């Protein structure tokens, strides 16, 4: 089954171009009117007095190359089909459209199709009288013995250098020389957990190695140099850094580009950046470019690192602002700092105290919740994410630990409730921890005001309902908690009646085919009908334990 949002395969590249133009922040992109099979994007603010810088290649590497058209970078980009070089006619058309007397530089990634098609177009353009030079970028170091290293993400840095000198009116020889220098001092290496999905691909599964990563996988899914037996971010980054250090000159300041190959989450890219800043390369890194998606391979689950050796003109070119959609501003690696809060601690202050009755209730409730962990997880797996038992068991173990270490104010219920509310936000994940914290915090405040325990618990319930948005009948723990607390208002010492009310409320959730709160609200009626809400069941079991005890 295809893993790609698109309309028609034949319109895919054109649709991609349209989207890029529509969202251009500088409003400086335009299609070149031509044969429908020729897809060229150009600068609207074209200045033919300057050297034109043209790049392109197969689509599927977005934002390359359209995302780098604009003042200070590319003049035009020629877009082929997905992972297919543009035609000779398309490249020649682009040259003719944007090249003036200053000439043009073609920047080409080192793949056979691109070399041949751009190369023949350059020869034809020269025959027509155009001053054309072509630079082939081969920055991939993953296969060091390869006579023709592939052009990958480092190509974007060459765009930046060439565009800088072209924008400032330098002649073609100078633009070419500076771009060649940049290319010869640019080193890239990629890694991926899996290859990419092609549009409309239904049979072939992306290549992947469970528990492993493929070093040097190509930007079209070509096999890499080796499969490594780890997916640990620090180990992967350090291995890549070792290979970059082996290829780089022994000294010299660097800018390093962190490129998302298309399918890596923002969170993972942040972790990768952190690992790079902790790697043996960190002392030489003056500038970071990214993390960002710059040269992708559709949805490939991978990333690449590119290092460029800095000298004065290269550094200035990299740091100069441009008017493109996707060039990220380089930044120096930042120090991780902490700001000390000037506010007084909001933590609950207390003195531990003893109360045998309260201690017995805390022991009973926490033990009940711990014992219910597996049962509630199984119930939650049918209507949620299968972790409610573990969530409440973790909270129960925390409170029980404080009890056993005699670190609870058992003789001051207002402070005890406030402390429980504070701890629950720390040890309970998700919204459940916050809701129960609201419940106990509000109840504790009501006790401070002189209310009795049942009144305080009902106040906690009211605040839980207000902030959480759920009510009785919404298939949540409130379906058991509210009937039980209502029963206690009428009969404060009748725990059996409270349990009966809670159990009846929990059982009513089996008859409900619609949840109005929590994760269950996203499930179908078929998934809910006949299954008791685990939160309601949990509360009913707590009241059952209390009713059957001799603590009441």
Curated annotation (Swiss-Prot):
Q: Which Gene3D superfamilies match?
A: 1.25.40.340, Dihydroxyacetone kinase, domain 1, Dihydroxyacetone kinase, domain 2
Quote the catalytic activity from the record: dihydroxyacetone + ATP = dihydroxyacetone phosphate + ADP + H(+)
Locate the residues binding substrate. 58-61, 109, 114
In which residues is ATP bound? 385-388, 431-432, 468, 476-477, 533-535
Q: What is its EC number?
A: 2.7.1.29
Q: Which sites are catalytic?
A: 220
**What InterPro entries does the record point to?**
DhaK_ATP, DhaK_dom, DhaL_dom, DhaL_dom_sf, Dihydroxyacetone_Kinase
According to the record, mutating residue 385 to A results in:
Loss of kinase activity
Which is one Gene Ontology cellular component term of this protein?
A: cytosol
- Which Pfam family, just one, is annotated for this protein? Dak1
- What class does this enzyme belong to in the EC scheme? transferase
Name the pathway. Polyol metabolism; glycerol fermentation; glycerone phosphate from glycerol (oxidative route): step 2/2
- Transmembrane residue ranges: none
Q: What's the record's remark on domains?
A: The C-terminal domain consists of a eight-helix alpha barrel. The eight helices form a pocket that includes a tightly bound phospholipid. The cellular function of this lipid is unknown; it has no significant effect on enzyme activity.
Q: How does it assemble?
A: Homodimer.
Q: What does this protein do?
A: Catalyzes the phosphorylation of dihydroxyacetone.
Q: What is this protein called?
A: Dihydroxyacetone kinase
């Amino acid at each position: 089954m295809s893993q790609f949002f698109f309309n028609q395969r034949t319109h895919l590249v054109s649709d991609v171009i349209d989207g890029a133009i529509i969202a251009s922040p500088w409003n400086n992109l335009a299609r070149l009117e031509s044969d429908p099979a020729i897809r060229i994007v150009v600068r609207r603010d074209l200045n033919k007095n300057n050297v034109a810088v043209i790049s392109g290649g197969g689509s599927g590497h977005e934002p390359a190359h359209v995302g780098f058209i604009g003042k200070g970078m590319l003049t035009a980009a020629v877009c082929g089909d997905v992972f297919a070089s543009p035609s000779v006619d398309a490249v020649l058309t682009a040259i003719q459209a944007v090249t003036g007397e200053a000439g043009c530089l073609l920047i080409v990634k080192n793949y056979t199709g691109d070399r041949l098609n751009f190369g023949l177009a350059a020869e034809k353009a020269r025959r027509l009288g155009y001053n054309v030079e072509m630079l082939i970028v081969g920055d991939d170091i993953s296969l060091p013995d390869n006579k023709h290293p592939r052009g990958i993400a480092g190509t974007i840095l060459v765009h930046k250098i060439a565009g800088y000198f072209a924008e400032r009116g330098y002649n073609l020889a100078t633009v070419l020389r500076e771009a060649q220098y940049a290319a010869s001092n640019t080193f890239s290496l990629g890694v991926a957990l899996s290859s990419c999905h092609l549009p409309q691909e239904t049979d072939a599964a992306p290549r992947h190695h469970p528990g492993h990563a493929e070093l040097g996988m190509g930007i079209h899914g070509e096999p890499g140099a080796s499969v490594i037996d780890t997916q640990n971010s620090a180990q992967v980054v350090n291995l890549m850094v070792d290979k970059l250090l082996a290829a780089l000159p022994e000294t010299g300041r660097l800018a390093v580009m962190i490129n998302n190959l298309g399918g890596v989450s923002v969170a993972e890219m942040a972790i990768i950046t952190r690992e790079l800043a902790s790697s043996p390369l960190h002392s030489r890194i003056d500038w970071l470019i990214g993390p960002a998606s710059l040269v992708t391979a559709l949805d490939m689950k991978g990333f690449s690192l590119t290092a460029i050796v800095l000298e004065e003109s290269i550094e200035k070119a990299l740091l100069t602002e441009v008017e493109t959609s996707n060039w990220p501003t380089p930044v120096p690696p930042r120090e991780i700092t902490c700001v000390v809060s000037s506010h007084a601690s909001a933590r609950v202050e207390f003195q531990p105290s003893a109360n045998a009755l309260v201690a017995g209730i805390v022991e009973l409730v926490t033990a009940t919740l711990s014992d219910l962990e597996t049962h509630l997880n199984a119930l939650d797996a049918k209507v949620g994410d299968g972790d409610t038992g573990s969530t409440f068991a973790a909270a129960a173990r925390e409170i029980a630990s404080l009890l056993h270490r005699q670190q609870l104010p058992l003789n001051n219920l207002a402070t005890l409730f406030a402390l429980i509310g504070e701890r629950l936000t720390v040890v309970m994940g998700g919204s459940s921890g916050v809701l129960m914290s609201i419940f106990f915090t509000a109840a504790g405040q009501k006790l401070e005001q002189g209310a009795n325990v049942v009144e305080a618990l009902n106040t906690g319930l009211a605040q839980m309902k207000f902030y959480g948005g759920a009510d009785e009948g919404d298939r949540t723990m409130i379906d058991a908690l509210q009937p039980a607390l209502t029963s206690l208002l009428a009969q404060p010492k009748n725990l059996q009646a409270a349990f009966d009310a809670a159990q009846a409320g929990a059982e009513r959730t089996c008859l409900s085919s619609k949840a109005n709160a929590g994760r269950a609200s996203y499930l179908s009626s078929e998934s809910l009908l006949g299954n008791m809400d685990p939160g309601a069941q949990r509360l009913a079991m707590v009241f059952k334990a209390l009713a059957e005890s001799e603590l009441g």
